[in-house]
Amino acid sequence: MKGKTCFYDVEALDGDIRICLKGEMDHHNAVGVRGEIDKLIYDERPKRLMLDLSEIGFMDSSGLGFIMGRYALMEKLGGTLILENPNERIVKIFELAGLQRIVRVENSKKEKTK
């Protein structure tokens, strides 16, 4: 599936959903992807939504807003959001924003953090 320069693949996993985001997560892309993913969440009601960020090369404050919006939606529906495999630049953005204190972040190549 495709936003402007942000693409994503969806994988259903026994009541969970993993979405692999690819490209850039900025204002223009977050708007398009947001509606599609929210519809998927409402339709499927996953226990866990895992956003794989390993292929995101750029993220700005709109990307953080996108993540926090999905966090709030999953909390509202009784589910959990997990961010997977962010690169070092994205981790730095999360640290500066304090996001890792709120949303679970896991890296399959390193230790899991929360």
Set out the residue ranges of the language-model regions.
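STAS-like cytosolic regulatory interaction modules
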Residues: 1-55, 72-114
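Short, solvent-exposed loop/turn at the beta-strand->alpha-helix junction
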Residues: 57-59
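Histidine-anchored nucleotide/phosphate-binding helix
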Residues: 67-71
